[in-house]
Design a protein with these regions (language model features):
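Short polar/charged helix/loop
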Residues: 1-84
C-alpha cells in the first residue's frame, strides 16, 4: 500500500480551528491520512476552550500533544485545507 496523504489544516493563529481539525483527523482518520496544522502567526498556547471541549468530548489532550506552529514548520503536504 502507498503512503497516506499528508493533510494540513491552516488558520491564522493555529490556536483553535486548525488544532481541533488536526486532533480529530489523528483520532478519527489516522488510517486514511496524516494530519498536521499550522498558522500564518503563532500564539503562546492553543485555545483553552478548544482544549477543554476536545478532551471532554473525545478524551484527546491537545495541550500535551500539540502547540501553535507556523506554516514553514510543517513537512511537505499533499492537501491544504484553509479554515479562515
Amino acid at each position: 500500500m502507498g503512503q497516506k496523504p499528508k493533510v494540513a489544516f491552516i488558520c491564522v493563529h493555529n490556536s483553535c480551528r486548525s488544532q481541533i481539525a488536526e486532533a480529530l483527523g489523528k483520532y478519527l482518520a489516522s488510517d486514511v491520512f496524516e494530519s498536521y496544522s499550522a498558522g500564518t502567526e503563532t500564539v503562546p498556547q492553543i485555545n483553552q476552550d478548544a482544549v477543554r471541549l476536545i478532551k471532554q468530548l473525545y478524551g484527546i489532550d491537545m495541550e500535551q500533544a500539540q502547540y501553535s506552529k507556523l506554516l514553514n514548520e510543517l513537512p511537505p503536504v499533499d492537501i491544504v485545507i484553509t479554515m479562515g
